[in-house]
């Protein structure tokens, strides 16, 4: 059985210099290395805010030499304005019909939403979306899921938003698209702050590492170990920054 993700708990809540964070405890990786994790709470980040300023405000007071920062992809999307609003997306005939056949899960609407499906069509083209839909329908008969996203490619699986059940009203009207230069963004943030950075798109189902600065002292597998229980939390917890502190 894998590690079960959990929400931040009140008994884990701490505060330092006005910064609220949650002590997510120690986790041991497959290689025996251990990591302390701190989930740092922020305000709801708006489009165009500075990622450097956010790190200096929320992360700097808790940072120790040797720590690694897991920076949430949704916040990075907001900072670099990698977003689309409903007004910018016009669902056509195919989007208005195909969305009914898409799946849905508790972390988001998947493609079960015409605006989101139209955004994918705009990104990768209708022929690829139709091919992906056919492949997905066939493979689902054999219990294979996720083929639609693999065939579409181009980071389609990282699109979030247009989700009317979100706790945040802004996400009802806006979609976030993972940036296509994650390594560069991490390198620039390290250059500006001196803190090694990993860009993570995490939820309770998976933890996708989008990029990292070259100064991160952990392997990709060790990063996955440190984030295995999704210490960022799920939904409305507003803890997109995770300080990973290697202990041995």
Where are these regions (language model features)?
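N-terminal and secondary-structure boundary signal
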Residues: 2-248
């Amino acid at each position: 059985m894998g590690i079960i993700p959990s929400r931040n708990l009140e008994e884990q809540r701490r505060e330092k210099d006005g910064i609220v964070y949650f002590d997510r405890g120690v986790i041991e990786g497959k290689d025996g290395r251990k990591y302390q994790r701190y989930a740092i709470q922020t305000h709801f980040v708006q489009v165009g805010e500075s990622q450097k300023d956010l790190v200096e405000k929320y992360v700097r007071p808790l940072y120790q030499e040797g720590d690694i920062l897991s920076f949430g992809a949704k916040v990075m999307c907001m900072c670099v304005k990698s977003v689309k609003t409903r007004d910018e997306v016009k669902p056509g005939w195919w989007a208005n019909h195909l969305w009914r056949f898409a799946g849905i899960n508790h972390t988001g609407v998947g493609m079960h939403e015409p605006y989101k499906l139209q955004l994918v069509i705009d990104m990768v083209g209708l022929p690829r979306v139709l091919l992906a839909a056919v492949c997905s329908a066939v493979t689902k008969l054999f219990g294979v899921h996720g083929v639609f996203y693999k065939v579409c490619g181009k980071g389609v699986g990282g699109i979030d938003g247009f989700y009317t059940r979100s706790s945040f009203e802004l996400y009802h009207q806006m979609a976030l698209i993972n940036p296509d230069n994650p390594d560069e963004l991490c390198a620039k943030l390290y250059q500006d702050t001196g803190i090694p950075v990993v860009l993570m798109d995490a939820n309770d189902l998976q933890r996708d590492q989008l990029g990292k600065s070259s100064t991160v002292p952990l392997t990709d597998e060790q990063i996955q170990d440190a984030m295995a229980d999704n210490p960022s939390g799920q939904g409305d917890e507003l803890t997109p920054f995770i300080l990973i502190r290697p202990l041995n």
